[in-house]
């Protein structure tokens, strides 16, 4: 059921990179066969209504991809142009968390307010960053970048769940990081959840076998349940790194196949 005074959003998942790996890298309890190929994709997302354009996460740079051994297919910021979005004009960017693959390129959004959870800023600049295992997925330049934007009065903090705009809500879960959040949007097919890293892969959720980069395992598993509860059905859940998103959902046009998916539309074959 649509909320009162809701806006209806088109939702775009834009793939900008991949990483070839085995199943053992993607699950806390490696499934059999644990050495089978199990790549992940890297995405940014865009939520577009008649009145608002909101970018969700900002991806990583080519330099970051090279340092970390990731396949960088295209610039995530430039790729927004594929769906008619000029990053220089975007006024609202949701940072679901500040890991390197979600919080880079902030300087490419000169007019944006960056939305982040209180707990994420505290986590990535606090005592837990003394430990390499917890800071490994953060890029110090990105962390300095969001602090710089704070001093430029361009960061909006959120403490838990909130409505950003009519029909677009933010939900804190923690787990993967202390300040991990996801986005829920009202679409023509109902409530769709852009889970980001609250749920990396469909199988992490369905098999109750979470992704192994985690601050609190229990919070991550509870986060899977919250994602599922706030989506209208399992087909309304969009994981943060699953290659099947490109296979399941239609592209806006044939030339954007395997680059952009319209996740506000029903999966193919339904």
What is each residue range found by the language model?
Residues 2-37, 260-270:
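Basic, amphipathic N-terminal segments that precede the first structured/catalytic domain
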Residues 2-4, 74-85, 89, 119-172, ...:
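Metallo-beta-lactamase
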Residues 16-17, 58-61, 98, 119-120, ...:
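Active-site metal-binding loops of divalent metal-dependent hydrolases
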Residues 11, 47, 57, 90, ...:
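Divalent metal-coordination and catalytic microenvironments
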Residues 16-78, 182-196:
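Conserved beta-strand hairpin/beta-sheet module of binuclear metal-dependent hydrolase folds
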